[in-house]
Amino acid sequence: MRGKHIFIITALISILMLAACGQKNSSATVATATDSTITKSDFEKQLKDRYGKDMLYEMIAQDVITKKYKVSDDDVDKEVQKAKSQYGDQFKNVLKNNGLKDEADFKNQIKFKLSMNKAIKQSVTEKDVKDHYKPEIKASHILVSDENEAKEIKKKLDTGASFEELAKQESQDLLSKEKGGDLGYFHSGAMTPEFETAAYKLKIGQISDPVQSPNGYHIIKLTGKKDLKPYDEVKNSIRKNLEEERTADPIFGKKLLQSELKKANIKINDSELEDTFTIVSPQGN
């Protein structure tokens, strides 16, 4: 969540709580200027109109997730202590700069984050683990943004050009190009689905046709394959890898949150906020 966004939400919650406790004071003055007066009711309406749906989304999302995927106070406190140790005397300033009112507000954000991480980890099923029970493979690639360019490179490779030299000359992957496109060994699930599907179909030494992924167009060469270990020996490491990859993927987290909210039977009683969950997207965690 962005700090400014959290600050607005926190401020709005406080104001609306005060409003609920004192409706008779809705005409009270919040601020004045020459020929201008801002009443409490006008101020509250503007806040609700501008930020009410964001606030409602955040409140319900946090409530749904933290109640379904419970984490201990000890785990929350450990994360808070880590932050305090990291920032030392600057801890309060860091909270302020990120729009957090106080340590209790920070704890709420940590609790939500830990609960989301727990939800993501529990999303990994036995079927997911078995689907990724594949040997580690080693591959090199040449990455370009244009399909026609990828086809031209493939033609050169088909006529005997060096894969490693073309990778150094043409690849747009700065991390691997100086190594001739070498990506090293990787396990199932480590690469984009498009890349992985193509790579696992290759025989050692074989070069693929151009493969499109969100990163561009890849030409892939399979250069190694490890022996597949017994399932019982590797299933825990496969699960851990999947958990870590999903936790690090913000898109997966957003989709999971949306799925959980759909299952939560949410009913909005305020007509001005009733479309909150059709037009507001999660801000991340």
UniProtKB/Swiss-Prot annotation:
Show which residues constitute the signal peptide: 1-20
- The PpiC domain covers 134-224
User: Record's Pfam families?
Assistant: Rotamase
Q: Write down the membrane topology.
A: Lipid-anchor
Instruction: Give its localization.
Output: Cell membrane
Which residues carry the S-diacylglycerol cysteine lipidation? C21
Q: Which residues form a coiled coil?
A: none
Where is it found, in Gene Ontology cellular component terms? Answer: plasma membrane
Which EC numbers characterise this protein's activity in its record? 5.2.1.8
One of the protein's GO biological processes: protein folding
**Alphabetical list of InterPro entries matching this protein:** Foldase_PrsA, PPIase_dom_sf, PPIase_PpiC, PPIase_PpiC_CS, PrsA_foldase, Trigger_fact/SurA_dom_sf
Tell me where it mainly resides: membrane
Reaction catalyzed:
[protein]-peptidylproline (omega=180) = [protein]-peptidylproline (omega=0)
Give this protein's Gene Ontology molecular function annotations: peptidyl-prolyl cis-trans isomerase activity
Q: Where is the lipid attached (N-palmitoyl cysteine)?
A: C21
**Keywords, comma-separated and alphabetical:** Cell membrane, Isomerase, Lipoprotein, Membrane, Palmitate, Rotamase, Signal
Q: What does this protein do?
A: Plays a major role in protein secretion by helping the post-translocational extracellular folding of several secreted proteins. Important for the secretion of the protective antigen. The three PsrA proteins in this organism show different but overlapping substrate specificities.
| PANTHER family from the UniProt entry | FOLDASE PROTEIN PRSA, PEPTIDYLPROLYL ISOMERASE
HAMAP family for the chain: Foldase_PrsA (MF_01145)
The family assignment reads: Belongs to the PrsA family.
Its recorded name reads Foldase protein PrsA 2
Q: Which organism is it from?
A: Bacillus anthracis
